[in-house]
Amino acid sequence: MSLESFIITTFNNNSSTNIDNMCHLYVKVCPSSLLFRLFVECCDINKLVEGTTPLHCYLMNEGFESSVLKNLLKEYVMNTFNVHDIHYTNI
């Protein structure tokens, strides 16, 4: 399931969401020599979980587009972590 599908499904399955709710996505980045893998650790719709670096997505807005989520992930998630792959060799 894609990240976008996961988030949309979570919102659709949660009857307690309303327009004022904010989705906090807590993520971890797993590095490799070739790519970064992004895993959603928690989708906390009602702000019940505390985290150090939440990504805030306002998904209840009908005008929300997936490209916005992609840009938020790039801007706020990747730059939040100082990730270095010790196995990577620069050729």
Curated annotation (Swiss-Prot):
This is Protein C15/B21. It comes from Vaccinia virus (strain Copenhagen) (VACV). The lineage of its organism: Viruses, Varidnaviria, Bamfordvirae, Nucleocytoviricota, Pokkesviricetes.
